[in-house]
Amino acid sequence: MRRLVVFAVLATLVATGTALAARGDPQRRITPADEARAKAMLVRQSDLPGSTAGAPTPNVDFYCPGLDASDLTLTGDANGRRFAVGLMIVASASEVYESRADAGAAWRRATGAEGVQCAKSLLGRQLAQQRGRLVSLRQIPFPRISDRTIAFRATMTATTPQGAVTAYVDVIALMRSRAHATITVGSALTTPPRSEELHLARTVAKRMANAMRGA
């Protein structure tokens, strides 16, 4: 769930929502069954007709004491590919924890005040390196479609040869049983379409429910 608070700003001015780092990461005891569950939850190209597929989302090293997850254990994780549709980019990621207690602890840390502050600091630094600026990062309303659901929106500006551009990145996080999944939707010039976000989130939530049934 640490990946909820990480946004790597891309050359396209759209951010992705996945990252892992060595320091503060959960312990890894990956099992084939939970790894398969994590992969089954991801957004697929067939979910986005007319999209083009890119590389998996990049990793970004970061550390915030309030998000230290070294006392928790992951048993599966997956990092999805990026998909582009017009000015919109979509990415997804998933994690399966050893226990519901670990999953709950990770969720609370990432969605609490320290998690949001970590995201603001990290995103601000990354944008500054690319001649950009973070305008705001805030929680936005989103319907509950899983055991737990939360969404955030980052608004940012960047300087391009064509002038200043505003970009928006929404991160929707879901928790089901021992699993977390994030869907990241980025868009330049206008906010991401809510109908598309709902479609993707409901699709992932259904896959999570199927993958975690009996687990």
Which residue stretches match the model-derived regions?
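N-terminal "mature-domain start" segment
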Residues: 22-86, 119-134, 138, 214-215
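A short acidic-to-branched-hydrophobic micro-motif
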Residues: 77-113
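A short, solvent-exposed beta-edge/loop patch
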Residues: 25-28, 45-47, 132-212
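Second-shell loop/turn segments in exported
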Residues: 32-34, 90-98, 186-194
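Sec-exported extracytoplasmic/periplasmic mature domains
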Residues: 43, 47-53, 98-102, 108, ...
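Positively charged n-region of N-terminal signal peptides that target proteins for export
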Residues: 1-4
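Sec/Tat signal peptide C-region and signal peptidase I cleavage site
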Residues: 17-21
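Bacterial N-terminal signal peptides
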Residues: 7-16
